Amino acid sequence: MRIRVLGCSGAIAKDCRTTSFLIDDDTLIDAGTGVGDLTLDEMRRIDRVFLTHSHLDHVAALPLMVDSVGTARGKPLKIHALPETIQALRAHIFNDLIWPDFSRIPSESDPFIQFREIAIGQ
């Protein structure tokens, strides 16, 4: 297993990115601003994201990443999170006001993202 630290800060500044870890080449733990340092090809290879919670320093790059590579992936990005985190993302980010609801785009049967509920200890 290869773990690449993309960011581990609670704020942004020069050489300072918010929380995100790339596991091997296909799994993200959180999606902070460090995701923006990945190439489009690296983003395209990510198949799943595990979110620890809904604070912006852990999810800020998620909508931008999906927007950047959604059409090039060929399959939905799976977002694993607690039910309350998924609810917060739907209500405050992927709501067609702040950002498009990519769980229904390009269609509900073939979306760019799929939310997967997990439980503590799972």
Predicted regions and their residues:
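Binuclear metal-dependent hydrolase catalytic cores
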Residues: 1-122
